[in-house]
């Protein structure tokens, strides 16, 4: 055969295929299509797999489609860590995991309750779902008020809705933030759906949406010895024009040179998005409790934080990132 039996990978290369190869005959054989090629090769293709590959029916193993949400009309997806922490062969764990990952695919976030409150738990949860991805902030980072912060997250000031690290060529895919302590006054959490925001913009201000989807921007992080720069549009679409990814962080974006009209449209679009996301009607606002963990899609859901008083109590979160491959393949 031309396919390795164990790993299902091809054993031939493009150089093994004759130029001008064509299918010369095809016939149904039960639930398969037998195709004969001009070089004498014959292959057996399951009809169900062909129909699925052509997109005529939905892939039963594909994650649920994303659903744009606003707080007033959407559920607030949560799951208990105890329900999903075990092996998939344990009673109830597979079903709870399917529900958890389905909620995450639809809404772009889930709050995981009842996790252990020890340092490093965030990595344990992350490695249960996928694999921790390290960067210049380490494998696991601490979010607390620091005297010399390497990021505004490590201060007590308000943080507006944003996605993390848009300056990376591969922007971190999924973020986990685990609450170890939240005793200070303030410091409430906010989530905003970037899919809902960009869909609203496309409906109401299509020219501004076009500007943010086509004009590339320099995203930059510069700590002297640690510099990262990437150039991308704020809104990234797929080949069919559907939402794929949002890079929105007004602390770190630097527009590239553009003519007056394009630049005006870009700035107007940036302001429109910022205003939409800053509207409490579009924000899911809540307070993380000790043992709560926010699991969110950094390509879609923006997170924010109200200011807090570090003298009024201790506030300490730990965070890390994983990639989409983890939950997508489960």
Model-derived features: where do they sit?
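N-terminal alpha-helical targeting/anchoring segments
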Residues: 1-5, 28-38
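A low-complexity, Ser/Thr/Gly/Pro-enriched, surface-exposed linker/loop concept
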Residues: 1-24, 48-70
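Short, exposed beta-strand/loop patches in secreted or surface proteins that constitute
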Residues: 24-28, 235-236
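Short, structured motif recognition centered on aromatic/hydrophobic residues
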Residues: 31-37, 43-50
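Secondary-structure transition/turn motif
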Residues: 36-41, 247-251
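Short, surface-exposed beta-strand/loop "edge" segments at domain boundaries and coil↔beta transitions
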Residues: 41-45, 117-120
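Active-site environment of non-heme Fe oxygenases that use a 2-His-1-carboxylate facial triad
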Residues: 62-109, 114-330
């Amino acid at each position: 055969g031309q396919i390795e039996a164990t790993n299902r990978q091809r054993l031939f290369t493009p150089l093994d295929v004759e130029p001008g190869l064509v299918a010369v005959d095809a016939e149904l054989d039960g639930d398969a299509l037998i195709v004969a090629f001009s070089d004498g090769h014959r292959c057996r293709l399951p009809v169900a797999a062909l129909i699925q590959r052509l997109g005529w029916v939905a892939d039963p193993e594909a994650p649920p489609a994303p659903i744009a949400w606003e707080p007033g009309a959407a559920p607030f997806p949560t799951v208990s860590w105890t329900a999903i922490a075990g092996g998939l062969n344990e009673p109830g764990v597979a079903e709870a995991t399917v529900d958890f990952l389905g909620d995450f695919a639809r809404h772009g976030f889930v709050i995981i309750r009842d996790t252990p409150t020890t340092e490093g738990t965030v990595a344990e949860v992350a490695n249960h779902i996928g694999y921790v991805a390290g960067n210049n902030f380490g494998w696991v980072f601490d979010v607390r008020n620091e005297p010399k912060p390497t990021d505004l997250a490590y201060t007590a000031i308000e943080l507006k809705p944003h996605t993390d690290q848009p300056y990376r060529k591969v922007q971190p895919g999924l973020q986990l933030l685990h609450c170890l302590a939240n005793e200070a006054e303030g410091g409430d959490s906010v989530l905003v759906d970037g899919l809902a925001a960009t869909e609203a913009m496309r409906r109401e201000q299509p020219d501004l949406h076009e500007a943010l989807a086509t004009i590339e921007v320099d995203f930059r992080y510069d700590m002297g010895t640690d510099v990262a720069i990437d150039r991308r549009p704020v809104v990234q679409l797929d080949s069919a024009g559907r939402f794929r990814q949002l890079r929105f962080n007004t602390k770190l974006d630097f527009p590239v040179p553009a003519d007056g009209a394009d630049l005006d449209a870009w700035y107007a679009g940036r302001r429109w998005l910022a205003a939409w996301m800053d509207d409490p009607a579009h924000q899911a606002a809540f307070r993380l409790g000790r043992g709560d963990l926010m699991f969110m899609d950094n390509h879609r859901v923006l997170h924010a934080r109200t200011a807090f008083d570090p003298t009024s109590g201790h506030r300490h979160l730990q965070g890390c990132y994983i990639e989409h491959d983890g939950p997508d393949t489960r």
